């Protein structure tokens, strides 16, 4: 990996703005998620609190790349020591290689998924190293899911690209959730509200992250 080449490829934003902070900084792929992390720092939280809140919020407003159904890893530096948290996900315990002889099963539907580790990693990090109450960590993501966020150009383009795949799933569950009226892509700037996800996150907030794996969820 050529670090110098990567750094030289970075370009400043068109407005030439930069961010400066004395006590902490949060960076993510979506403004609402970044705000969630900053909110934790303002409440007196540490870097772990900010990272956990940011990750949960990304799962709401960046569903194409983040979410409760994904896998996550973490690298942290605490008290002079560095730690890596391996959240690589695995196939369900009852899965068998014969399931995946069909190419479609390897790409689409529930059989193509692995056991999600994202929430377990976030919960572990918060339990072990976090400072703020768990409910405060989850609160921003609940609010974003309830109030919604504006669909980006990338999300619109991905919905168009994957439209056939969405509609090919027998249950149409993905189409009902991610497409407008379950049929067509959202337009850029449309507000995307996720009431079901807000309820799920509210349960996670109230009962802890383990409810996702061992509880009613």
Question: Residue spans of the language-model regions?
Answer:
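Noncatalytic scaffold domains of N-terminal-nucleophile
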Residues: 1-35, 39, 47-214
